Amino acid sequence: MTRISWKENRVLSIETRKGVYVVGQMLKQPYIRFYNMFTTESSPNNVNTIKLTVLFTAAITRQFLRYSQVYVLKDATPDIREIDSDIWINQFSGSRKVIAYQGSGEEIGCMILGNKPGGLLVKKNLWWIPTTEQPIRLHPSGVFDEIICSDIPLTANDIIDKYELTGLCVFPYTNERLYLCSLYNKSVDPYKDLTFNRNLPDNYRLAVEIISGGFNDKKRNEILSTYFTDSQI
């Protein structure tokens, strides 16, 4: 694949699992807004993102763009409105081990961020730009602007489902997450569900295996071939 340079409001088609593509739009770097439009065409014509439903907006890594199959939709119409939420979920400091699918006989252990379940509800304007008067964000951490709730209840499903984690999207986890979004016709995030100690459906298993990183080279190559035959990661 040709390396894709960053251009604000550039509309993209990104492969999730092999042969299934999602529409995304570059915003202020490094954020991409993903839409609930999935297709088996790598380059659908005349896409108008103004008419599409947003799945989620998240920060992505260069690694995600480098190893994903990405196509620029040159005839697409971007939505240039700043419609993205400024409310996010920030995980607690530290890390911990969690066990997914306990009691199933096929448990998967994962190390995830956060020294305890849950997280903070925070305000973070993705469109913010440093200035001489305000070179860093307002919160002392410099990561977000302010804390709205210092400990989101694990039962606050409306909040948990509505807001994104502040972490970065990587390949191939995000690709698998987007594929799951296509199955559920909404935004889902196995990593966030692990963060909040939720029970996981069985079709999240591949995503959890990717999160765990606990496989040998042979298994790793098998997982990668699920996504891209010629992936060189």
Which residues are covered by each model-predicted region?
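Short N-terminal edge-element motif at the start of the domain
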Residues: M1-T57
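Intrinsic disorder/low-complexity segments enriched in polar/charged and small flexible residues
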Residues: E8, N90, I129-P130
